[in-house]
Amino acid sequence: MIKHRIMSAATLLGGVVFTGHAVAQSPEVARRLDAKYDVVWPAADGLIRVNKGGYRIPDSRMKSNGKYGYADTLGQLVVPPAYDDAADFGNGHAVVGRKAGDGRMLYGLIDRSGRVVVPLEWERLGGVRNGVCVARTGTAAEREFLLADTLGNVRSLGYDYCSDFSNGLARVGVGAYVEKENVAGITLRDAYEFRGKFGYIAPDGGIVIPVQFDDARDFAQDGLAQVGIQGKYYVKWGFIDKSGRQVVPCNFYSAEEFLGDRAVVSKVVAGGKLAYGYIDRSGKEVIPCQFDMASGFRFANTWVGMEQDGEYTYTLIGPNGETVLPFRVGDLQDGGKYGHAAASISDAAGRKLFGIVANNGKVILPFEYDHIAIFSEWDAANNRWQESAMGTKDGQNFSFDISRRGE
């Protein structure tokens, strides 16, 4: 069987992504675990998630025929592979799942010794935050949300909806579940969606921001959350702080969380078209809504795009809208861990040529390849991300180490 190393300390469990702080393990430990298990994750909170009998699939979830357990950073097995689903450890605990006789996956919580502290009887269970986690029972229109602590105490919250805790607060809702329209006829992970009003609670279950918003997002690390108020035609978005104070009015068709001092927002412009731009933390539109695509400032500069006849071209700009790259590119792949982006330009004959641009606008691989793709992989031995590029040119394959190159 092919062995796999997971390239991210994240997994999708019960419909929610859980992440843990990655901790380096020695190359020797990594080799021993790779030889013994079929899938090995980076260490998180001092323990390494392993899988026996499964294999990695493109969306990073596992086939259900594998079993999950945990080893320590010395390679010693701590929790034998006995679970049908599992998340990384975080805050001393991990969510694990086991299939019931009726085929449902039921989740519970274990501590670092493998002791079950919350029984495996919930259709969904979030990770531990502030000493508590959110449990859910019921999967259709009737659902109950509960608050569980690490001592195993569980109590009903009394809301129709509750998210996991994020930066000290959780979203709660009062309303109802309606069946999603399934035009494509595909199997949906959750066939129902919640519609109602939203507010926020503290880890003790007490209300902090009253239920009042027509839509809401989790609080980010900067202490702000996007909230939406129904307008005449659509929900309009803005930002509040943890006291509930409106710091950016609900004036936008969409609003992403702040990265640095800029947030991507959009407005409806002439002809019903969406235009994207950027605001600062006061809500001022510092880069006007004029683009057909805009990405957040994960690094010093970012990419914006314009569409014409179904084709997008992209420009690299700075935080005040200044042009960083003096030409436009196509076929943008900007998911690199260090800000690198693969893209294309066209020669005089219209042939696409691919290269790689650093976030500072420097071309670090010339535009002369038939295709280029960027890959990121966690390097446990050096406790860092390793970034590579694979390119083709005239039928030949090339590989490049581009980790932090050009920055």
Feature map (PLM): residue ranges:
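Bacterial N-terminal signal peptides that target proteins for export
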Residues: M1-A10
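Sec/Tat signal peptide C-region and signal peptidase I cleavage site
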Residues: G20-V23
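Bacterial N-terminal signal peptides
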Residues: A10-V17
